[in-house]
């Protein structure tokens, strides 16, 4: 079991105070501060000795028990969710988003060589999908299987228990185009580097195939088992395998697994939408409340409204984040009345508070 964040932090504080010596505490700070200040300056001279587990990615469906889904996911760092969309649904979403995608240029607008390479010179990364596709909202944003995975991931092992959408964007990569650099997605949230591979997940990614993913057209490449490696182990492209999928399938990966968009060796476009989900105490990649229209939000369920930041967030042990006058944001936005908001939050009101359940003596 992965130690939850609060236990790792509290244990560190308890260890410090147990020294009963300012001198020892000062030595501890001097010894560890450089590592904190250089969170993601992981040394490059560490021998690269980690090896992949050599597994093919498992394939599951929405009918697969979550225990089995998570077993495969935690073992290799990725799992393929089959037939989440029908080909007709995928085509409908593509059609509804056509004008939105056409309005976005290929390649990055940022004049920075590394960022431009990571973006992909022939890749279209279009956001603001929720306003433009009713089918996307109904079949992805409101998908019960997707939310069940999120609830399990961000609720287990002492995790914060609440989550929201970080980004919903296209990753439409035309070819020919070289592969991305191998990376871990958790680099967006540097403190998680201190927790190591046994820490809780800072984010998860659902990569939906809107065209077939093949080895030749740039299927996401992943190093199975690298989610368990020390973070100074970076792997290499020869250790990766392609996550080949049919249109409508979805690749689920966590923030700790090493992966990259593969090289597109063809003249065709590999079409993808990524749905990135994070604990609701972290900052999303997309500023949804400034992008999604209120008239669109009113068409969503309460769960989806909270998912995109139009309702308050309630991580375990918190009296509420993202509020107005210290109360549910939906009241301020006219999305609910007090009675409706309280009924919706009953599961939050009934949960034990984190500070009531921590046994500090046993940490």
From Swiss-Prot:
Keyword Ribonucleoprotein: no
Biotech relevance: The sphingofungins A, B, C, and D, show a limited antifungal spectrum of activity but are especially effective against Cryptococcus species, fungal pathogens causing opportunistic infections in human.
Swiss-Prot/TrEMBL catalytic activity: sphingofungin B1 + 2-oxoglutarate + O2 = sphingofungin B + succinate + CO2
InterPro entries on file: Phytyl_CoA_dOase-like
GO molecular function, one term: dioxygenase activity
An annotated GO BP: biosynthetic process
SUPFAM superfamilies attached to this UniProt entry: Clavaminate synthase-like
Keywords, in A-Z order: Dioxygenase, Iron, Metal-binding, Oxidoreductase
Binding residues for Fe cation: 183, 185, 259
Coiled coil regions in record: none
Subunit structure: Homodimer.
Matches recorded under PANTHER family: MULTIFUNCTIONAL DIOXYGENASE AUSE (PTHR20883:SF19), PHYTANOYL-COA DIOXYGENASE DOMAIN CONTAINING 1 (PTHR20883)
Family assignment from sequence similarity: Belongs to the PhyH family.
Protein name: Dioxygenase sphC
Species the sequence originates in: Aspergillus fumigatus (strain CBS 144.89 / FGSC A1163 / CEA10) (Neosartorya fumigata)
Lineage: Eukaryota, Fungi, Dikarya, Ascomycota, Pezizomycotina
Gene that produces this protein: sphC
